[in-house]
């Protein structure tokens, strides 16, 4: 399954539309747990805070593409203060958006939209920062380039991608230790596929060339994560 020199994009169980709601929620809950334990949320927060630190209270809209149950936006809402910052989660899955709305009830700055992001009219809907966490590895290279081009159209300030590092060491760690801290079979199964479908730094550079970007920044994090920051204001 794991191939060092190329991504192995096998379907994950959680991508199957026939996966029952309870099983899917188990997978989402495990992803949220891993993000909290291994700093996934914090890495995105740090990147966004750096991007907006000189914004001087100007309105900022942050979009989370492939938001799932909205856990990332709830985390950002908790740690980024000010009514001038608004959060919008976009997901193609109706049940994910329904779950996100239920879990985010009472958060006035957070809202969600069920939509295919590729079909959004950017003349009437845009944002300042677009972020996406553990979503990109679900797609093949040509699909990723298509998404990134759309993201560039939407985001006036920057794109922040948070995703996995394709590493034999990470694959081995997860294979042997995930039964200890992950209860659900779907998460153990999909976790290995996710690592095999993840990225090396050279992959991001190929995508950058494909979308005409040369000022991006790729940051490696200790938990086998990459934060990929793509400024979009210098076009």
Predicted regions and their residues:
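C-terminal alpha-helical "lid/dimerization" subdomain adjacent to the S-adenosyl-L-methionine
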Residues: 164-208
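Conserved beta-strand signature within the Rossmann-like core of class I S-adenosyl-L-methionine
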Residues: 155-164
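Class I SAM-dependent methyltransferase "Motif I" SAM/SAH-binding loop
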Residues: 66-70
């Amino acid at each position: 399954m794991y191939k060092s020199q190329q991504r192995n994009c096998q379907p994950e169980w959680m991508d199957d539309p026939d996966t029952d709601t309870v099983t899917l929620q188990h997978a989402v809950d495990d992803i949220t747990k891993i993000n909290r334990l291994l700093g996934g949320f914090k890495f995105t927060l740090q990147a966004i805070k750096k991007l907006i630190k000189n914004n001087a209270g100007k309105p900022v809209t942050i979009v989370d593409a492939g938001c799932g149950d909205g856990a990332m936006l709830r985390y950002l809402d908790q740690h980024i203060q000010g009514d001038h910052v608004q959060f919008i989660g976009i997901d193609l899955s109706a049940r994910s958006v329904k779950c996100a709305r239920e879990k985010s009830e009472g958060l006035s700055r957070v809202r969600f939209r069920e939509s295919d992001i590729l079909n959004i009219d950017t003349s009437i809907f845009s944002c300042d920062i677009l972020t996406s966490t553990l979503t990109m590895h679900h797609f093949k290279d040509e699909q990723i380039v298509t998404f990134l081009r759309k993201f560039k159209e939407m985001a006036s300030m920057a794109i922040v991608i948070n995703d996995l590092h394709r590493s034999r060491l990470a694959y081995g760690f997860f294979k042997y230790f995930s039964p200890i801290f992950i209860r659900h079979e779907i998460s153990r199964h999909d976790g290995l596929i996710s690592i095999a479908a993840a990225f090396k730094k050279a992959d991001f550079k190929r995508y950058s060339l494909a979308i005409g970007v040369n000022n991006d920044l790729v940051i490696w994090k200790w938990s086998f994560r990459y934060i990929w920051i793509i400024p979009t204001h210098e076009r």
